[in-house]
Amino acid sequence: MSGRRAIASLALLVAAAGTVSAMPRPGGGARIPATSADFHLPGTQPDPTIDAFLPGVGCSSCHGSYDPNAAPVRTWVASMMAQSARDPIWHASLAIANQDVAFAGESCIRCHAPGAWMGGRGAGGTMENFWLEPDLDGVNCMVCHRMVNPETGPLSAVGYETNEPYDPDPDPEVLSPLAAAGLVPGPGQRTNGAYVVDPRDTRRGPFADIPVNYHSVPMHHSPFHSTSEMCATCHDVSNVITVRRPDGSWGLDALGTPHPTARGNDMFPEQRTYSEWLNSQFAREGVPYPDRRFGGNHPTGVMRTCQDCHMPDTQGAGCSLHVNTPYVRPDVPQHGFAGANSWVVRAVRAQLGPEEANAVGLLQSRVDAAIARNLQMLRDASDMTLSQAGGRLKVRVVNQSGHKLPTGISEGRRMWLNVRFVSASGATVAESGAYDWATGTLLDPSAKQYGAHMVTDGELAEAAGLPDGADFHIALLNKVAMDNRIPPRGFTNASYAEFGGEPVGASYADGQHWDDTLYPIPPGATRAIVTLWHQTTTREYAEFLRDENRTDQTGQVAYDLWVQFGRSAPVSMDTASIDISPACTGADLNCDGAVDGNDLGILLGAWGTPSADLDGDGTTDGNDLGILLGDWG
């Protein structure tokens, strides 16, 4: 199948998402009648007359056919950045977003398909006008390397002296027309895809020492490209139709007009990966990693920026014409953008088919390498330790990442602990967090899970005809019902509350970047085996996308691919085991071999805290007292 036919087929699959109008829901209600104006944000506006965004595969001849670790296109093409517009989970979510809120997809397309958005083909919030090859290229080379710092200063671009004509200060030419129209994103507005791009075909990047410009367009040195602020553009995401109320809740903004401030923190915080980093030790002073788990060939091993971890320094060359001395350098940023997605890029290749996938550079070997990078990133993001405290097993999960763990989109994403106590013969005595691999179901509702539960509530639920607390409707989210994700180093409750990222239904002390869970040790257990699992897409979310979609087949397609690729098979982030002292079991809190008044005193002294929690619910209370009395003697 040709590239044009593949795009047309995919566009037809999702085009019907733009035809829904006031569709009634079970239980009443209708789609919220927003307009395109409700999703207007500052930044460069869609304009079909700007220089076209070229497809990433066109960069392969110089940037993709050599070193599998350093060649930018070779690693980028199998990343979720590259495949963000082909992601079947996103297609299904986009259809439901447009069902729920008219034009809601415009907010999604800004970051998932910026080339199409900038070319004016994302109007209405659907993909029905995605006809050009770069439209499905996701966040491709041209998108990032034409981005402009919206704030002039030391991070502004400087033109290479070899450019003809020489332009030492190219950014004001881009920003001045936007300033005249009141469209330069100000502080707090540089999120939600409110990017500034050069309307001209130029190349901006982080290096000032590129020896030769082989492009037919100007090159500019842009320090902005080495900063996390560039990543903030699409990694702090808010529900644009919401507005913060005086009581701290988020309600429905007035429809038919842009958001009154366009500031992300005045909207519901759907994703806050950048803000989580900004309010951490990483942003303030950096975090050293003597084990070099992050950063690749980084000169110090001190991680400060998003790029330090997600674009690690690599020994090699950024161009196939410079693969030999003296052009090889130690700091080529790897463009794999490793993250937490364990299966979707495989599904993208399957949807395209081998011929079309290979034509866009999505070779099977590159997919396998990308998945391997993601799995290693997950393993590096956490550490886990086990210890015995009397009759309890303590499991500590340490967040080693620069943001919450897990972070990003909350829908369908979770971690959980599987704890299995075994006897001397190897038989399972007790288990928490059991999982059914055949159905993709977490069987234990009381298992320790980490994630965020965001819901639709109050006036948004009423306007959409949904019950309070409805799950997964991403365009309608306006309440954090629970968020027990583990914060990063340097976390403070006050700073996180300012951007809506404070823990909900969980408690972390300032500076705490770990979580402890206590498990009562059952009689007969001689060993405990613990695994921290991560899952990209839960069964509940996959079924929601299938069942809630009344627009097209993208929900069924996403569900079928989810099944085909192992039901988003959970990935082990950490696993460990510990031998259990036989004298320390059950409610024997002081490990003296008997449950008596001494243990009762310990339990009562720990009342309301987790330190004598026998049933694993996180607190010492009457349930634990009942367990102790039942084990008396």
Language-model-derived ranges and their functions:
Residues 42-61:
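Local sequence-structure signature of Cys/Sec-based thiol-disulfide redox active-site neighborhoods
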Residues 23-42, 69-94, 125-512, 517-523, ...:
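Primarily the internal scaffold of c-type cytochrome electron-transfer domains
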Residues 110-122, 126:
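Conserved, well-structured interaction surfaces
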Residues 582-633:
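Cellulosome-associated attachment modules in secreted, modular CAZymes
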Residues 90-107, 117-120:
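N-terminal catalytic scaffold of extracellular/periplasmic and nuclease hydrolases
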Residues 9-18:
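Bacterial N-terminal signal peptides
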Residues 1-10:
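Bacterial N-terminal signal peptides that target proteins for export
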